[in-house]
């Protein structure tokens, strides 16, 4: 191999590594179990998937109960989604990334009429982007499945939070797609 072709090979390899490092990562919660081993509902304080740690943004302020997440099944598809298990106190769900990411797209489903908010934060806890809906898409007819919808935020993102449901409502994240910063 000549020096020029060796250098060309190394540059090609470096370019391929650069492109691969920015590939989109997908989380789908399909490894979550509908019931825990003891038969109890699937409420957890923390969930980790592909290095992303899901928690509530803060502990409950209106009760002494432990803040928990839950996995919720979309009836029409069987897909599993993650949501706040706090039915009487709306607490945002937080997803913290192991390294900064440049964009996050979440596929959600929710109670009819629920507002939805997706916020992106940098490592200094500053909001860098926000997406919101005053009311999520609803069913066209009563027999239709609850529809999915997407929300996207961009920036130098350390973590995101999603929220919006009022007492008794839910907002479930079906799939989280993110692109690591290069």
Please report, for each region that a protein language model flagged, where it lies by residue:
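Bacterial N-terminal signal peptides that target proteins for export
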Residues: 1-9
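Bacterial N-terminal signal peptides
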Residues: 8-17
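Surface-exposed, well-ordered secondary-structure segments
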Residues: 21-182
């Amino acid at each position: 191999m000549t020096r020029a072709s060796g250098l060309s090979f190394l540059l090609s390899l470096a370019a391929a590594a650069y492109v691969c490092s920015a590939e989109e990562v997908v989380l789908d919660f399909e490894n979550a179990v509908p019931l825990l081993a003891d038969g109890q509902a699937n409420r957890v304080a923390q969930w980790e998937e592909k290095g992303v740690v899901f928690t509530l943004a803060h502990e409950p302020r209106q009760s002494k109960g432990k803040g928990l997440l839950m996995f919720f099944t979309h009836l029409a598809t069987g897909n599993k989604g993650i949501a706040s298990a706090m039915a009487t106190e709306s607490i945002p769900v937080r997803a913290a990334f192991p390294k900064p990411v440049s964009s996050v797209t979440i596929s959600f489903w929710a109670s009819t009429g629920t507002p939805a908010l997706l916020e992106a934060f940098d490592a200094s806890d500053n909001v860098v982007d926000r997406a919101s809906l005053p009311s999520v898409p609803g069913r066209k007819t009563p027999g239709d499945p609850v529809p999915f919808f997407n929300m996207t935020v961009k920036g130098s993102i350390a973590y995101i939070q999603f929220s919006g449901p009022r007492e008794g409502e839910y907002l479930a994240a079906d799939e989280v797609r993110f692109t690591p910063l290069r």
